[in-house]
Each structure stands twice: as C-alpha cells, then as structure tokens.
Amino acid sequence: NMFTLYFYFSFVTYSLRALSFLILYFASLIIGNLLTLVIHFNQPNYSAVGASGAVTGILFSSLLLFPSIELMIFFIPIPIPGYIFGIGYILYTIYGIGAQNDNIGHSAHFGGAVGGVILTLFYDFDVIYNSKLMLSILCLTTLVAGFLLYGKKNKN
C-alpha cells in the first residue's frame, strides 16, 4: 500500500490542494472501512487492518485526474493504460470479495475506489469533461460490480 501511495500521491497533490488530498485520503479510508463493515457484518471472526481503502482512493483519483496515465505491474514490463488497469482492478476486487480465499481487504479496496472517484468529482468537476472515457468505464464497472456484490450478499 505505501509503495502505491508513494508513486500516486504526487498526481493528486499536483491537481488538488494538500488539504483536499488529506480529506480524500481519510474519506476513502472511512468509506472503505464502512463497506467492509457492511459486507462482513455477520462474520465475527473477520478482521482487517491497513490503509487499503485510502490508498485505493488515491490511486483511482490519479486515474481520473490523469486519464492518459499508464501503469506497470511488477513482473510485467509492459505499460498498461489506466482505464484497463482500473477495470481489471475492480473486477479482481469483486472476485476477491466473493471468493474470500485470501487475506486481502478487497471490500476496503472497492469502497476506497468508489470514495476516491466520488471525492475527485467533488473537488475537480472538470474531470467529467476531461476524463469522459475513464470516468464512464470506471463508473460502469463499479455499478456492475456493485450489483454483483448486492446480489451475492442477498443470496447469503
């Protein structure tokens, strides 16, 4: 998480003020934690710790503020367009929430991503005009993922 934060906080602080960055960070953290609480409410043995939601909020804010950004994943030396990474990240996160077979805070990641997108729109409304493709893809993927989560939660 801190490695990701180190590389992407500068994108957000470049576009938003320092205070806005801090609010975005902590609000994404809280939203991620609240979603985790909702999803795992009936699982008394579930525990999580870390800044997953906050860091994911910063990452997705960066994707919106700089739609032409390219990312590289460890061991894959090929630049990936931000919107492709965003789709893959959300889909993997939804899979992880459903599978619950590892010790990763997928629900915090999802909540943080949603918080990062919403707060970025609040702070920089021009993102709607400058990042139409990225915003459309992230919102559509997030909506579909949200419906899948809701359906899975209601089946249990």
Residue ranges and their predicted role:
Residues N1-N156:
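A detector for small-residue-rich transmembrane helices and their helix-helix packing motifs
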